[in-house]
């Protein structure tokens, strides 16, 4: 398994929906979460870049699918934040359609990172994202963000509770605590991404050799 240098990650493009994404080749790992789950902060922490993903003071601002390339053919995908109360209902439905379409149809999608505030995990739409991924045979890493907001005992209790709850999905769902501020869980995230990004390599090599 190759240890990728995530600091080399760079922005490629924004797309309003799956039809405007580049060709469905290589490997993609998508990041999804409610609008205030700390998704942009997690991407910036992962890549050790202050402004790779824009952190907005106005949750629900990111309405586009944003693509970042780690190395050639290996991409991180920042999906639109979901579930923000002040976003019009029609826009919410549009986002949810776009998210569902991406998870169901994108062949290069290898893994899904679902981010949730550790204090308010497993809201309806979080569960919907995990369910979609499991039904599409996509592995999931749940990051319980803002873990620094809880004392150690409460943090462990939440982590154990969510780990227990996700068993009901009957899929490959891993759960870790994460803090952008304290850099907690970053190594676990990198390890998971490395494993996802290396999974298709043998198949590609076989095809090249034919």
UniProtKB/Swiss-Prot annotation:
Would I find Metal-binding among this entry's keywords? yes
Q: What protein name does the entry list?
A: Probable GTP-binding protein EngB
Q: What does this protein do?
A: Necessary for normal cell division and for the maintenance of normal septation.
Q: Which gene encodes it?
A: engB
Annotated Gene Ontology cellular component terms: cytosol
Q: Which CDD domains match?
A: YihA_EngB (cd01876)
Show the InterPro entries listed in the entry: G_ENGB_dom, GTP-bd, GTP-bd_ribosome_bio_YsxC, P-loop_NTPase
Q: Which family does it belong to?
A: Belongs to the TRAFAC class TrmE-Era-EngA-EngB-Septin-like GTPase superfamily. EngB GTPase family.
- Binding of Mg(2+): at which residues? 40, 62
For binding GTP, which residues are annotated in this chain's numbering? 33-40, 60-64, 78-81, 145-148, 178-180
List GO molecular-function terms, semicolon-separated: GTP binding; metal ion binding
Query: What's the cofactor?
Result: Mg(2+)
All copies of the EngB-type G domain together span 25-199
Please list the GO biological process terms of this entry.
division septum assembly
User: PANTHER family of this UniProt entry?
Assistant: ENGB-TYPE G DOMAIN-CONTAINING PROTEIN, MSS1/TRME-RELATED GTP-BINDING PROTEIN
Q: Which UniProt keywords apply?
A: Cell cycle, Cell division, GTP-binding, Magnesium, Metal-binding, Nucleotide-binding, Septation
